[in-house]
């Protein structure tokens, strides 16, 4: 979730949602 965008990927980034 770069910039907080909830993009569904195989990983969870620092946003705590998706990459």
Swiss-Prot record:
Q: Does the keyword Glycoprotein apply?
A: yes
Biological process annotations from GO: defense response to Gram-negative bacterium; killing of cells of another organism; neuronal ion channel clustering
Query: Which UniProt keywords are listed?
Result: Antibiotic, Antimicrobial, Cytolysis, Glycoprotein
How is this chain modified after translation? Glycosylated.
Any coiled-coil regions, as ranges: none
Q: Which domain of life is it from?
A: Eukaryota
Q: Provide the function of this protein.
A: Has antibacterial activity. It inhibits fish bacterial pathogens, A.hydrophila and M.luteus, and also E.coli, P.fluorescens and S.aureus. Forms large ion channels responsible for disrupting the cellular envelope of bacteria leading to cell lysis.
The protein, known as: 27 kDa antibacterial protein
Species in which this protein is naturally found = Cyprinus carpio (Common carp)
